[in-house]
Amino acid sequence: MSKITLIGTDLAKAGMEFTFVGPLSGKCDECSLRNVCFNLEKGRHYRILNVRENINPCFIYNKNKVSTIEVEEATSTFNVQYSRRIMEGSSIELKSMECDYLTCPNIETCNLIHIKEPRKIVIKKILGRIECPKGYDMRKIES
């Protein structure tokens, strides 16, 4: 089921995916459109299905304009430490690895800074093993 929300006009392109991080400024509390802007769940990954013609003013985004868009929750991929419970169809509690290996190419999918923890997910697919420079047995999963 799709939802209606707002995004900066320069980002409003059908097919684009983003992770909703919540309000970007305290000024958003004063805006009459805040309920439309923030009706998504923080930390969830969304795909833009359709960009509507409606354009509204916004003092946060560049160009000071936001477009009305239809979104659906997109498939998300995460890296998790392997255990017996990591199998397709199982429900797990997603937690950040809080890794400090800053040059690792997987740090963003291991350190889940945009995810409200803990979050339960269902593993749709195990995409494979991830090479971890710290030696952890990691798997890339799709939920």
UniProtKB/Swiss-Prot annotation:
InterPro entries: UPF0179 (IPR005369). Pfam families: UPF0179 (PF03684). It comes from the Archaea. Belongs to the UPF0179 family. PANTHER family: UPF0179 PROTEIN MJ1627. NCBIfam families: PRK01177.1 (NF002253). This is UPF0179 protein PTO0851. It comes from Picrophilus torridus (strain ATCC 700027 / DSM 9790 / JCM 10055 / NBRC 100828 / KAW 2/3). The lineage of its organism: Archaea, Methanobacteriati, Thermoplasmatota, Thermoplasmata, Thermoplasmatales.
